[in-house]
């Protein structure tokens, strides 16, 4: 299938983007447009695959786990490109690129790309709009999670106050972008449900967790407006709620019959659980490494660097 082939090629372009970004960590002279170019090509290939699959289905391809993961990775690729187009931070960009790679890799290597008929309940004009709003909001929140994690780490270390200010502003902008889309996602979801099932609310677990996610970011915006320190922690709490909404509720028996549940019957449970635990495991390791770095005297770090340069 051509769309599956294009998504596979896009996956490797995202990998090239990650590798060149890691190179930039040690060789800053390499322009950031190289990994950004790979990211843009990957996103463009995914958009082409999306249109091809739409032409085959005669409907928006956002109804199976494979299609949702491909669409999410496309949104994450766009979020990475536009976030780091002006904000040149190789380490942050590398951490953010892991998100579309993980999403697309899961789709390609664990989910079936076969075309499946769209059930009547999903054939609503509101459904593609609802999923698109949700996708773009979660993509912004995903990159925001990486930014907030690094911001919190720098604050705990007491380092780079100027960088802290820039990261705080970047995280706030990402939330300002994602929050309206998430709000529209809730509204269009209610319109879709009312149009398809004559009721805007079904007391569905995914509806509740999505509403909780909205509330978390609404609280963040309120705390930020009041200039309350520590509001950035809600970027991590919000990401936990996003992952719970996207993956976690799939393990709830009452949610498996819901139209909101995209998990495939053959999807390995451990892999889906990894979607929840993975980002926080990475965060824990990063914080531990930074804590170890803080205990190392700065003079020792400078001395080691001088010795290394002398041996070259």
PLM regions and their residue ranges:
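Hydrophobic cores of alpha-helical transmembrane segments in multi-pass integral membrane proteins
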Residues: 3-117, 132-154, 166-196, 202-312
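Acidic/Ser/Thr-rich, low-complexity mid-to-C-terminal regulatory regions of eukaryotic proteins
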Residues: 121-132
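Cytosolic, membrane-interface loops and tails of multi-pass inner-membrane proteins
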Residues: 158-165
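Low-complexity, intrinsically disordered or weakly predicted helical/coil tracts enriched
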Residues: 115-120, 161
């Amino acid at each position: 299938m051509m769309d599956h082939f294009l998504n596979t090629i896009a996956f490797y372009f995202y990998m090239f983007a990650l590798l060149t970004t890691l190179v930039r960590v040690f060789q800053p002279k390499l322009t950031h447009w190289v990994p950004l170019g790979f990211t843009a090509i990957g996103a463009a290939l995914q958009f082409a695959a999306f249109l091809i699959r739409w032409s085959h289905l005669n409907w928006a391809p956002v109804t199976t786990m494979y299609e949702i993961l491909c669409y999410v990775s496309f949104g994450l690729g766009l979020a990475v490109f536009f976030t780091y187009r002006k904000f040149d931070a190789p380490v942050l960009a590398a951490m953010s690129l892991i998100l579309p790679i993980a999403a697309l890799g899961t789709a390609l290597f664990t989910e079936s790309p076969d075309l499946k008929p769209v059930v009547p309940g999903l054939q609503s004009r509101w459904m593609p709009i609802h999923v698109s709003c949700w996708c773009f909001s979660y993509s912004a929140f995903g990159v925001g999670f990486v930014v907030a994690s690094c911001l919190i780490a720098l604050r705990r270390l007491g380092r780079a106050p100027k960088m802290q200010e820039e990261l705080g502003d970047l995280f706030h902008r990402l939330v300002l972008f994602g929050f309206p889309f998430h709000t529209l996602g809730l509204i269009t979801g209610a319109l879709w449900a009312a149009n398809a099932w004559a009721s805007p609310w079904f007391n569905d677990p995914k509806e509740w967790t999505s509403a909780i996610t909205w509330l978390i970011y609404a609280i963040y915006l309120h705390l930020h407006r009041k200039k309350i320190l520590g509001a950035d922690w809600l970027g991590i709490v919000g990401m936990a709620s996003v992952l719970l909404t996207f993956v976690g509720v799939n393990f709830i028996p009452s949610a498996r019959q819901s139209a909101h549940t995209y998990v495939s019957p053959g999807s390995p449970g451990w892999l889906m659980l990894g979607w929840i635990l993975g980002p926080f495991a990475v965060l824990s390791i990063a914080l531990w490494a930074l804590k170890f770095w803080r205990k190392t005297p700065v003079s020792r770090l400078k001395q080691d660097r001088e010795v290394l340069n002398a041996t070259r």
